[in-house]
């Protein structure tokens, strides 16, 4: 397996798809890196020469923020929003949707499982016999 930016890249896949295993590299950026390195995107990783692998490594390391650095930046950005107390920061702090989605219904993924309320679901005034 080839290791680029701290991530093991699968050998048996095409380079175009293998690069997308790196956090921070999607389809568009993968294609851009391959064009810069002068590597055909349909070639398999195990067929790459050491020179091509080194070119890919250099381009990714120099020009793009990926993996740990990117994760750290995202975390710090969210922490900054929380610290300054802006609307988005408050939404992050309370684990609610940040981008204006409705929360009366839906938003279950962000809000977590339903919390049961005592006495809820029983008919009022109903007596057991």
From Swiss-Prot:
GO cellular component annotations of the record: cytosol; small ribosomal subunit
Basic residues bias (residue ranges): 95-114
Segments for region (Disordered): 95-129
Gene3D superfamilies named among the record's database cross-references: 1.10.8.50, 30s ribosomal protein s13, domain 2
InterPro entries tied to this protein: Rbsml_uS13_C, Ribosomal_uS13, Ribosomal_uS13-like_H2TH, Ribosomal_uS13_bac-type, Ribosomal_uS13_CS
Signal peptide: none
UniProt GO MF annotations: rRNA binding; structural constituent of ribosome; tRNA binding
Origin superkingdom: Bacteria
Keywords: Ribonucleoprotein, Ribosomal protein, RNA-binding, rRNA-binding, tRNA-binding
Gene Ontology BP term (one): translation
PANTHER family: 30S RIBOSOMAL PROTEIN S13/40S RIBOSOMAL PROTEIN S18 (PTHR10871), SMALL RIBOSOMAL SUBUNIT PROTEIN US13M (PTHR10871:SF1)
Alphabetized NCBIfam families for the sequence: uS13_bact (TIGR03631)
Family as reported in the entry's similarity comment: Belongs to the universal ribosomal protein uS13 family.
Described purpose of this protein according to its UniProt entry: Located at the top of the head of the 30S subunit, it contacts several helices of the 16S rRNA. In the 70S ribosome it contacts the 23S rRNA (bridge B1a) and protein L5 of the 50S subunit (bridge B1b), connecting the 2 subunits; these bridges are implicated in subunit movement. Contacts the tRNAs in the A and P-sites.
Quaternary data: Part of the 30S ribosomal subunit. Forms a loose heterodimer with protein S19. Forms two bridges to the 50S subunit in the 70S ribosome.
Protein name: Small ribosomal subunit protein uS13
